[in-house]
């Protein structure tokens, strides 16, 4: 592909019809995707001789080819644009980080004593789904509230089925003990019904009903029941006082965008059935100068068009307007089969909602930029400490975690001047090395990481930080030499004799270049932060791997118990601990387990 782009020749043949354009660089890499009412007019604006913002000019300088697709109308253009952005994620587009599917509160319907839980993903199980909520934290807050007020169980079914006495939740008055029959199905069903009323946003009607019940219980001289209902009403009133968005039963999303030279933030508040489900901050990637309206338009398009499973409210309240909002509404209606209203000029309570979202976006962006500056300052201090010409842009740190050689896991964490790059974090399950040999484990992890780098996978770090001192530093040198990786700064970190933070010894590139930094050095604080994050990431991976291995390793010794039976047994009893407590008769009642096999399992589990 030619690196010289003839804009005049291209524009001479460009159509004036609606469509989508794609800009590529000299290596055929997609740089940017856009849509236009008139392709010719929109593309001509990129190639004018003056007036371009610096970042936009940088994009134009890289253009080697432009491809266009004509569409029937603007709505089709917007839908195609969102599809291409989601598929290719071009670096110069405003990009919304790809999130997990939004969580729901799930109420099982097939159980005599239904369970409330957090649910993500496809809605395959029979039951009711409430939400979606903007974050798992918002769901946990609601579940915690429901557990306090109505004591509906949240334990796993396998755990519930195998209880012989009430658990701690019963002792602290967060559950009525349905697992051991301490509450009747009828009374429990009433608690479930009240929970559903709350989740549906009917908290006022629920409070009225509970008040009536409280008065009736008092008249019957059932003061214990009256006190229980009084406490439930008090919890509901506190929730209502905390939620300033009463005054309707509608479904509304309030979305506010803020853009500064340092970045952008979009704050979303979700209201369903007149009840606030929660809020969330988004920080879109903005590669070229964009007006706040453009950022908001891009966010709304990607948020509601690229994720069909997301709940669509009846109304959006926004803090800025854009001429393409009617096109967006049309595209959403076509893609989702439902229309929504976008409101900008609002009054009264709705104006307060709007301002609340703006304030939250401003504060979140301010905090993020302040933290970014803090981390960037530490990167500059590190460059000064290592006598580098400029601050590094990518720093990777490796660590090893195991329990006496069991379930060894290596971690790789990545930091840049903006903070941790968690999407680039990696874990490596170490296999085929002597138990407890940290050097061999590090050799394997580094070999796997940099072999993939040589194959074109991932980015080269500026600095490789290795926790473990001289020995691990030598191992890193060996791997880099074996793979012919050059131009990489090695930094080894060894804890002092007392292992106290601030007394670390550092090694630059080899063991002969040993030095220390003052305990109050920002550069040392950065090294400690990254090392501790690598340790955290390694140990959580190790614990998960060890737990999985320990859950199955004992059962692997039983002839006739394969992987499927092991999973079924653990699921039936709720874990290895409960399985170990089971008698032979209880084991024989599990699906697919004969009396003879139950005796064998019991013998293995109770052997010395």
Swiss-Prot record:
Top-level taxon in the UniProt lineage? Bacteria
Coiled coil, from the record: none
Keywords carried by this UniProt record: Cytoplasm, DNA damage, DNA excision, DNA repair, Excision nuclease, SOS response
Name the GO terms of the biological process aspect. DNA damage response; nucleotide-excision repair; SOS response
Matching entries from SUPFAM superfamilies are given as: C-terminal UvrC-binding domain of UvrB (SSF46600), GIY-YIG endonuclease (SSF82771), RuvA domain 2-like (SSF47781)
Instruction: Identify a single GO molecular function assigned to this protein.
Output: excinuclease ABC activity
Q: Where is the UVR domain?
A: 204-239
Q: What does the similarity note say?
A: Belongs to the UvrC family.
Matching entries from PANTHER family are given as: UVRABC SYSTEM PROTEIN C, UVRC/OXIDOREDUCTASE
What HAMAP family does the entry give? UvrC
User: Can you name this protein?
Assistant: UvrABC system protein C
């Amino acid at each position: 592909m030619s690196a010289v782009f003839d804009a005049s020749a291209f524009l001479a043949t460009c159509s004036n019809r609606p469509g989508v354009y794609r800009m590529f660089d000299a290596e055929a890499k997609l740089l940017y995707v856009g849509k236009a009412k008139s392709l010719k007019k929109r593309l001509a604006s990129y190639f004018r001789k003056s007036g371009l913002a610096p970042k936009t000019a940088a994009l134009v300088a890289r253009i080697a080819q432009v491809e266009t697709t004509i569409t029937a109308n603007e709505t089709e253009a917007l839908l195609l644009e969102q599809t291409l952005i989601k598929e290719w994620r071009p670096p110069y587009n405003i990009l919304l980080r790809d999130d997990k599917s939004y969580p729901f509160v799930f109420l099982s319907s097939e159980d005599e004593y239904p369970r409330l839980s957090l649910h993500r993903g496809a809605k395959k199980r029979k039951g009711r789904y409430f939400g979606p909520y903007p974050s798992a934290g918002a769901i946990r807050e609601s579940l915690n509230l429901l557990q306090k007020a109505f004591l509906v169980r949240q334990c796993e079914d396998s755990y519930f089925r195998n209880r012989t006495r009430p658990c701690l939740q019963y002792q602290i008055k967060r559950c009525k003990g349905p697992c051991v029959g301490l509450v009747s199905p009828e009374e429990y069903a009433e608690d479930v019904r009240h929970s559903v009323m709350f989740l549906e946003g009917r908290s006022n009607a629920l409070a009225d009903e509970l008040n009536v019940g409280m008065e009736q219980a008092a008249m019957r001289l059932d003061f214990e029941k009256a006190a229980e209902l009084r406490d439930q009403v008090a919890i509901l009133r506190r929730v209502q006082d905390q939620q300033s968005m009463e005054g309707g039963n509608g479904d509304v999303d309030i979305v506010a965008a803020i853009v500064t030279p340092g970045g952008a933030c979009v704050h979303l508040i979700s209201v369903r059935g007149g009840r606030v489900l929660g809020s969330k901050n988004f920080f879109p990637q903005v590669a070229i100068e964009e007006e706040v309206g453009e950022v908001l338009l891009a966010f709304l398009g990607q948020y509601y068009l690229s994720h069909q499973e997301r709940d669509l409210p009846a109304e959006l309240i926004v803090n800025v307007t854009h001429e393409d909002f009617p096109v967006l509404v049309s595209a959403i209606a076509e893609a989702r089969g439902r229309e929504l209203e976008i409101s900008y000029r609002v009054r009264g309570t709705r104006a307060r909602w709007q301002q609340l979202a703006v304030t939250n976006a401003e504060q979140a962006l301010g905090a993020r930029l302040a933290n970014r500056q803090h981390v960037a300052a530490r990167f500059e201090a590190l460059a000064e400490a290592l006598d580098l010409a400029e601050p590094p842009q990518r720093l990777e740190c490796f660590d090893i975690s195991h329990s006496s050689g069991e379930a060894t896991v290596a971690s790789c964490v990545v930091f840049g001047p903006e903070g941790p790059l968690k999407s680039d974090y990696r874990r490596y399950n170490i296999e085929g090395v002597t138990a407890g040999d940290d050097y061999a484990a590090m050799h394997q992890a580094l070999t796997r990481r940099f072999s993939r780098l040589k194959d074109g996978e991932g980015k080269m770090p500026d600095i490789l930080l290795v926790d473990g001192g001289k020995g691990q530093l030598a191992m890193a040198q060996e791997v880099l030499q074996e793979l012919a990786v050059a131009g990489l700064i090695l930094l080894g970190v060894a804890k002092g004799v007392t292992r106290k933070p601030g007394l670390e010894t550092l090694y630059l590139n080899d063991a002969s270049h040993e030095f220390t930094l003052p305990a109050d050095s920002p550069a040392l604080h950065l090294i400690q932060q990254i090392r501790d994050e690598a340790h955290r990431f390694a140990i959580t991976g190790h614990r998960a791997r060890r737990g999985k291995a320990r859950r199955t390793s004992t059962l692997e010794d039983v002839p006739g118990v394969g992987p499927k039976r092991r999973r079924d047994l653990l699921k039936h009893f709720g874990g290895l601990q409960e399985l170990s407590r089971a008698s032979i008769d209880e084991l024989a009642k599990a699906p697919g387990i004969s009396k003879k096999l139950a005796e064998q399992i019991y013998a293995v589990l109770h052997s010395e």
